[in-house]
Amino acid sequence: MGWIPALVILGLSSVAAAADDPIVEKLEHGEVNWTTKTVVATGSGAPNLKLENVAAVRLNAERAAKVDAYRNVLEALKGVKITAGEPGSKALENAQVRAQVQGILRGCKTVDTRYYSDGGVDVVVRCALDGGLATTLSPVKSYKKVKMDGEAKYTGLIIDAVGTTAKPALKPRVLDDKGEPVYEAAMVGPSVLRQRGTASYARTVDEAKQNQLVGKSPLVVKASALGEVASDIQISGEDAAALRNVNQTFLAEARVVIVTDGP
């Protein structure tokens, strides 16, 4: 089996391991499930009673509801944190980025359709944050080489940030005690970044350990503080050194889970 299909399978199994109590951030026009890395929004379509028959009225209302749902996803994305100091709204000010995102949203999955006796329709759509959306909203301009020689001591990284009020984001960073990056999106391979993003999120360390993403031998570290923005997590100098001095293949593959109290 090639490595790209393997990534797809791993991504699916990671989602399957999500907790019953997902990390959900409520936004004005929708919500983000940071456990499954998806954004969900609902659209409504009113009936056009001037149409010739019931089927035409329903179809027209369903189409209108879907367009409204896409519009609400776009609005919801404005509130999604790329980093805690960089909301999606900033990226979407760019007309080209906004047009690209609108095109990607056409591929969102309809997860529920509700029909009403008056002919109105509600449509619920769900879109994956990782992949095209994340890389379009915040492309990595340059990549950093990571240490890939030596013994592969760890299969993943779990950062216990419970109690630090760390905020989920598309591009969180892990910093040392001096504020220098130990892990960031620029260290992740481009194809991996598109496949599953920079990091996943969990509510407990036990839940994180059950995520197949981090493998059987993850390094577990405790966050000591937050950086200048709440999606940047600081770890001790000792833990940072441990990360820098080992084979970092697991970082290049974004095998990272951040444990947090939630948004």
Task: State where each predicted segment sits.
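Domain-level marker for long, solvent-exposed, non-transmembrane regions
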Residues: A18-P263
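Compositionally biased, low-complexity segments
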Residues: I9-L10
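Bacterial N-terminal signal peptides that target proteins for export
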Residues: M1-I4
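N-terminal signal peptide c-region/cleavage motif recognized by signal peptidases
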Residues: S13-S14
